[in-house]
Amino acid sequence: GIKEFAHSLGKFGKAFVGGILNQ
């Protein structure tokens, strides 16, 4: 559903941003 999609997208976003900040 929408909530599940938003949740997975949020987790991906956090991992993506975290990877950039850790470089």
Curated annotation (Swiss-Prot):
Q: What is the annotated signal peptide range for this record? A: none
Listed A to Z, the keywords are: Amphibian defense peptide, Antimicrobial, Secreted
What is any one GO biological process for this UniProt entry?
defense response
Subcellular localization(s) per the UniProt record: Secreted
Q: In which tissues is it expressed?
A: Expressed by the skin glands.
Alphabetical GO CC annotations of the entry are:
extracellular region
Role this protein plays: Antimicrobial peptide.
Q: Would you identify the family this protein belongs to, as annotated? A: Belongs to the gastrin/cholecystokinin family. Magainin subfamily.
What's this protein's name?
Answer: Magainin-R2
